[in-house]
């Protein structure tokens, strides 16, 4: 399957080169929030799973904490109602980075303080629960050790990338081409089938990190 991966990588690099003009650098926190709103309002593929808008609350600059609490509630409702239609990946490399530093690469470091040992342990325990409930897979993809990206498929013709580098630079790419969306879906399925660890192995790794963090508290 290495040949398959190499072929996808070459194809994707070609598409990336052709879409350089669509990449925008995000340096301001407000720009990141605007992209976050765009992601939240992305319609699902092929069907509407809720009649009501699941995200009526915008993130406001004023009274941000209360606004985020309300927003978090709606996000949880959305995930609960759509858990059969959502899937996610996290890497061994990203998990190790989180345990060691208290940072997730998804959010640039200037935006928040590193999480405490207790917070990291709490998140790892929740991750164990999420793996049991949702389609979340631990994958070994060392080629992505210095960046993180979230992918939102808005519909059958649109693919939205948000790429965050280790330095905190955020780039966004939108592709409006059905064949590219389907090609990326094939690549995603390859990662799931060939590069993911079993749930049992994921639990063992997470539990070992929890034990490691607990020892640091003593």
What is the predicted function of each stretch?
Residues 2-215:
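Hydrophobic protein-protein interaction segments
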């Amino acid at each position: 399957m290495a040949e398959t991966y190499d072929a996808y990588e070459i194809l994707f690099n070609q598409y990336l080169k052709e879409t350089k003009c669509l990449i925008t650098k995000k340096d301001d926190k407000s720009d990141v929030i605007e992209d976050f709103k765009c992601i939240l309002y992305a319609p699902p593929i092929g069907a509407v799973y809720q009649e009501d808008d699941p995200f009526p609350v915008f993130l406001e600059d004023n009274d941000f904490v209360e606004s985020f609490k309300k927003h978090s509630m709606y996000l949880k409702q959305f995930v609960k109602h759509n858990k059969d239609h959502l899937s996610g990946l996290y890497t061994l490399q990203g998990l190790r980075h989180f345990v060691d530093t208290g940072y997730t690469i998804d959010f640039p470091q200037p935006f928040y303080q590193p999480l405490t040992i207790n917070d990291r342990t709490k998140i790892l325990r929740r991750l164990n629960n999420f793996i049991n409930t949702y389609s979340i897979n631990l994958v070994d993809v060392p080629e992505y050790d210095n960046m993180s990206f979230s992918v939102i498929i808005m519909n059958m013709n649109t693919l939205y990338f948000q790429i965050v580098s280790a330095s905190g630079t955020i780039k966004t790419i939108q592709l409006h081409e059905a064949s590219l969306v389907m090609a990326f879906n094939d690549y995603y399925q390859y990662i799931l089938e060939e590069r993911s660890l079993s749930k049992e192995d994921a639990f063992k790794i997470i539990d070992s990190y929890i034990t490691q963090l607990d020892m640091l508290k003593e």
